[in-house]
Structures are given as C-alpha cells and as structure tokens.
Curated annotation (Swiss-Prot):
Protein name: Putative phosphoenolpyruvate synthase regulatory protein
EC number(s) from the headed UniProt entry: 2.7.11.33, 2.7.4.28
Keyword field: Kinase, Nucleotide-binding, Serine/threonine-protein kinase, Transferase
Domain of life: Bacteria
Gene Ontology molecular-function annotations: ADP binding; ATP binding; phosphotransferase activity, phosphate group as acceptor; protein serine/threonine kinase activity
Protein species of origin: Aromatoleum aromaticum (strain DSM 19018 / LMG 30748 / EbN1) (Azoarcus sp. (strain EbN1))
Binding site for ADP: G157, V158, S159, R160, S161, G162, K163, T164
Record's keyword annotation contains Transferase: yes
C-alpha cells in the first residue's frame, strides 16, 4: 500500500462543504486500498473564488503528478463555470441528482445555496438545542425518575462504553433526547436494574464493548488502577451482559462500530424515525 500514490481530493461547495465531504467520504470509503489527501474548500460563491480554486487544483495536479479528484456541491452556475475545464475527475454531486429530479417532478429546482440546511434550522433548531441540553444534563446517571420520563432513549452500560458520545451524537444529528446511565458493581451485586430505570424499561438500550478495548480506554483515564485492569473490565462486561439479558434489554457491542452505525442501530431498535439535521 505504501507504493500507492496519494490522490488529492477536493470537496468544493458554495456553503460549508459538509454535504460534499460527507457524500465524498462515503464513496471513497469503498476503496480501502487507495490513499487520499483531503482538502475542503467552502464558500466558493463567486467566479473569482472558483478561478482561485481552479488554480489550486491545477498546481496540485502538477505537484502530485496525477490529476486530483473533485467532489462539488456548487449550485450557482457562475462559480461552477470556472471549474468545468480543470484537469481533474470532477464529480458534480448535485447535477447527478437534481437533473433527474427536475425531470421526474416536472419543475425546476431553486438552485439555492444551503437550501437544505436552512429548512432544517428553521423548523427543528430549537428541538435540537433542547436535545443537546438534555443529553448534557442527564449524563452519567444524573437524572431523576421524572426527568427520565422525558427521554426518548436511555443508554445503559459500564463506564466508558461509549454512552456519552452516542447520546450527544443522537442529540446533534437527530434531535433525540438521550439520557445515559452507568451500570456499576452495586447493580451487579443486586442483579437487577435500579428502580428508576426499571420503570422506563421500554426506553432502555445497552452498549457493551470488548474488555481489552475497555481496559485500553480506562488506562488513559486512570493508569494502572483496578478500575482499568483487564480482570475488572472482563468482570464488569460479563456482569453487564448477564444483567441486560436477564432484563431483556436490547444491546450492541460498540467495539468495532462507528458512532453513526451505533446511532442508526439505536434509532431502529427503539423505533425513533428522525430526520438527519
């Protein structure tokens, strides 16, 4: 793989570039044997900026000795015209989909920059902020029984199994109110859920993780402690899984899963149909 040339990939947009980068990453991930250097170029909203971007792409082609790959979500025809003649693999992500949709729907698109993000922010921004605040206020078991009633989902699992980042991702991306609750040795000794969780069992979803990975994560937090020892991690993971099986809680091993995969699985499991913001 070290002999494989590095290809420079540009993500060009007249907005933030997030859409171009997200779609581009999904496509590039299908080529694990390739190596890429990624460059995001946002806010290319006039011809001068597009021509400057075209110059950067030409210089990169000369330096690399191979033409770059360009993912574009430009909708304004003026800056788009400044990039049409560059020596690169030019992937116009909007053109691939907008033209067929216009033909199918029988109407012209608005070609408005950032149109999707504007709609999302105007209708759902408040709900997303509320979900983020909820996740932060109900992290690591900091919840009363009454507050848990407002949760869309309650994540359970041992400490450092990925509950907090998943809760925040669900809030930011989907506006889901996610609380999380750590399973601790006292729960394992009782071999049952705390009362406040038991009353909301329908909202529970468990996260587990390989003991070796858990020990590695905990060592970074508390080096050479019993908390981080592989023996303790094995005990906690085994006890947590037994408890979740006994309580019939759906759970997922997060060891080799991305946060996107974990979140999608949770949404499907608890039947939450939410749009991505």
């Amino acid at each position: 793989m070290s002999d494989t040339p590095i290809r420079t990939v540009f993500f060009i947009s007249d907005g933030t570039g997030i859409t171009a980068e997200t779609l581009g990453h999904s496509l590039l991930a299908q080529f694990p044997g390739a190596r890429f250097r990624q460059v995001r170029v946002p806010f290319v909203d006039d011809l001068d900026k597009a021509l400057d971007c075209a110059r950067q792409i030409r210089e990169t082609a000369v330096t690399d000795g191979v033409r770059p790959i360009v993912f574009s979500t430009l909708v304004n025809p003026d800056p788009l015209s400044g990039l049409r003649e560059i020596d690169a693999l030019f992937v116009d992500l909007f053109e691939q989909f907008i033209n067929p949709l216009e033909a199918e729907l029988g109407q012209r698109s608005t070609h408005t920059v950032g149109r999707f993000h504007g709609i999302a922010e105007s209708s759902d921004y408040k709900a997303r902020i509320e979900a983020i605040n909820f996740a932060m206020a109900h992290d690591d078991g900091v919840s009363t029984d009454g507050e848990l009633a407002d949760a869309d989902v309650i994540l359970v699992g041992v400490s450092r199994s990925g509950k907090t980042p998943t809760s925040l991702y669900l809030a930011v991306q989907f506006g889901v109110k996610a609380a999380n609750y750590p399973l601790i040795p006292e729960d394992f000794e009782r071999n049952k859920l705390p009362g406040e969780l038991h009353r909301h069992r329908s909202k529970l979803f468990g996260l587990t993780i390989a003991p070796e990975r858990l020990s590695q994560i905990r060592q970074e937090r508390r080096p050479n402690s019993r908390y981080a020892s592989i023996e303790n991690c094995r005990f906690e993971i085994d006890a947590a899984q037994k408890l979740m099986r006994r309580e019939n809680i759906q759970w997922l091993d997060s060891t080799s899963k991305s946060i996107e995969e974990i979140s999608a699985t949770i949404l499907q499991a608890v039947r939450l149909n939410r749009p991505v913001y």
